[in-house]
């Protein structure tokens, strides 16, 4: 009955709207324990108050011309003396707070309120403003590292050039895979180190050298395709808004619209609008054979707002929207639910509800509705009963016949899977960011120093494991690979199965990368482009 953080979501049973600011958001189940929930609520109020003060302290001096917030420490000359004063000031309060036992936690409201101004409304407002302030501080920090300017300076630039100076410009302009970015900058190819066809010179907006089928070789065809892309992109952007916004407003899912609309009437109205335009286009309205090929830009622009930047941005946003519409359709056919319903299900259970949940043996899905075997119609060994996670009956060498050996192998597989998943990310992400191929890393790293550091990290863990850390020969549990490190208690039967499957994929992936480097001498991304 209380407002929720996202439409159509289901709040956990322990979040019933009793407390201020409760919107039913707890995907990790952190508030299930009442004592922990109590501490977290108090901590949120404290951090929210500090954040609100910090936001004011960051913006007001900048507004008054006293400098940027992150320069304050450099200019204030803060040293050991100042730190000691700060510690003495807040240390007394922290000690007093820590020694009070069985104190009433509601004393966080109002805190200091000699005039008795606190009401239910102000308590709720304080939580909301505190959350905004916490988000704002995170934004200030990110903004500082991305653009290197103050919040007010960035705001002034944005107000002067809202289309060119925005978050998309800052993020997408730096990302090497820029084809589908919403920014209008004309830099980068569709994939790092790709070789564009000679006919794609970068002359036209959002040309990223992508034409594997050589469709743009004919100039007339290329002109038609460019105009068609703009048209379809515009329709897709309108379509995406038309799918998402009504559902946000509680008007139902996009695929239910036909149930409440007269199809014949809609068809006649659509034809009455589209037919004259299509007739004009079919009768040479774009003068494709007369050299006037670019009437898609600006299209309708009575205020003359179109620039090279907006043209490129329109194409990129259109491509995003075309992809989104295809995704909405595929999502509906696969799940039968609306995009927001799928999103809320994913956010509530990101591991159990995602694109991979319906795939097969080596998929990341952890579902075990019925046992699947590694090959159709085979007979698994009698000792592989499907009880263990990821057991698909594959053991041609009979290695798992001994229960103790099988136990060791299970734990070892989990370890190697986790390492492989980390390794695969470490191989691909740096190359996507333009930092070179994975096998070139030793050109930049001192191997001896790296080995010493790695040994210092790994050796204690291996010593503990080798000296009975997993109690393989004792009567106690041998399954400390699950959950391993799981302070938030997120591990479930599903995640254990999914981890094994993803790990097997990753081990195959790493083996493939190694073979690929020896056979072709190129990185995985370059091989993919080729």
From Swiss-Prot:
A Pfam match: Chloroa_b-bind
Bridged cysteine pairs (disulfide): none
Localization: Plastid, Chloroplast
InterPro entries xref list: Chloro_AB-bd_pln (IPR001344), Chloroa_b-bind (IPR022796)
GO annotation, biological process: photosynthesis, light harvesting
A Gene Ontology cellular-component term: photosystem I
Additional notes on this entry: The LH38 protein is synthesized as a 100 kDa polyprotein and is entirely imported into the chloroplast where it is subsequently cleaved into 5 mature 20 kDa LH38 proteins.
Name of the protein this chain belongs to: Light-harvesting complex I LH38 proteins
Organism whose genome encodes this protein: Euglena gracilis
Keyword field: Chloroplast, Photosynthesis, Photosystem I, Plastid
SUPFAM superfamilies xrefs: Chlorophyll a-b binding protein (SSF103511)
């Amino acid at each position: 009955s209380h407002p929720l953080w996202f439409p159509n979501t289901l709040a956990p049973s322990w979040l019933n709207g009793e407390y201020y600011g409760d919107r039913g958001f707890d995907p990790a189940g952190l508030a299930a324990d009442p004592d922990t929930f109590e501490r977290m609520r108090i901590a949120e109020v404290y951090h929210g108050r500090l954040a609100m003060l910090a936001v004011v302290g960051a913006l007001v001096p900048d507004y008054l011309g006293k400098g940027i917030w992150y320069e304050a420490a450099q200019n204030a000359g803060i040293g050991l003396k100042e730190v000691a004063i700060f510690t003495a000031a807040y240390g007394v309060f922290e000690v007093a707070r820590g020694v009070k036992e069985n104190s009433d936690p509601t004393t966080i409201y109002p805190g200091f309120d000699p005039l008795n101004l606190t009401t239910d409304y102000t308590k709720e407002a304080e939580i909301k403003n505190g959350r905004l302030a916490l988000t704002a501080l995170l934004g200030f920090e990110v903004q500082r590292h991305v653009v290197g300017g103050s919040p007010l300076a960035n705001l002034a630039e944005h107000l002067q050039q809202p289309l060119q100076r925005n978050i998309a410009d800052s993020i997408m302009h730096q990302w090497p895979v820029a084809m589908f970015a919403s920014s209008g900058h004309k830099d980068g190819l569709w994939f790092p180190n790709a070789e564009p066809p000679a006919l794609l010179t970068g002359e036209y907006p959002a040309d990223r050298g992508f034409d594997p089928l050589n469709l743009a070789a004919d100039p007339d065809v290329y002109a038609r395709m460019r105009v068609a892309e703009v048209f379809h992109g515009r329709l897709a952007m309108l379509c995406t808004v038309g799918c998402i916004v009504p559902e946000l407003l509680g008007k139902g899912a996009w695929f239910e619209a036909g149930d409440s609309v007269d199809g014949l009437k809609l068809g006649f109205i659509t034809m009455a609008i589209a037919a004259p335009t299509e007739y004009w286009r079919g009768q040479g309205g774009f003068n494709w054979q007369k050299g006037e090929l670019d009437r898609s830009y600006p299209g309708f622009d009575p205020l003359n707002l179109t620039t090279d930047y907006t043209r490129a941005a329109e194409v990129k946003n259109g491509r995003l929207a075309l992809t989104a519409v295809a995704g909405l359709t595929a999502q509906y056919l696969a799940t039968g639910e609306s995009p927001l319903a799928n999103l809320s299900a994913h956010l509530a259970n990101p591991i159990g509800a995602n694109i991979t949940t319906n795939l097969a043996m080596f998929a990341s899905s952890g579902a075990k509705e019925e046992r699947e075997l590694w090959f159709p119609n085979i007979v698994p060994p009698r000792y592989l009963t499907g009880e263990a996670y990821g057991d698909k009956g594959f053991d041609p060498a009979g290695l798992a016949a001994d229960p103790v050996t099988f136990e060791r192998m299970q734990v070892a597989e989990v370890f190697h899977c986790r390492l492989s998943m980390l390794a695969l990310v470490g191989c691909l992400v740096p190359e996507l960011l333009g930092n070179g191929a994975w096998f070139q890393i030793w050109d930049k790293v001192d191997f001896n120093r790296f080995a010493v550091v790695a040994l210092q990290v790994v050796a204690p863990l291996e010593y503990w494991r080798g000296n009975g850390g997993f109690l393989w020969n004792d009567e106690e549990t041998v399954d400390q690979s699950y959950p391993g490190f799981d302070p938030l208690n997120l591990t479930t039967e599903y995640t254990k199965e999914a981890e094994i499957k993803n790990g097997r994929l990753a081990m195959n992936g790493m083996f493939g990368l190694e073979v690929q480097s020896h056979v072709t001498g190129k990185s995985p991304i370059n091989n993919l482009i080729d």
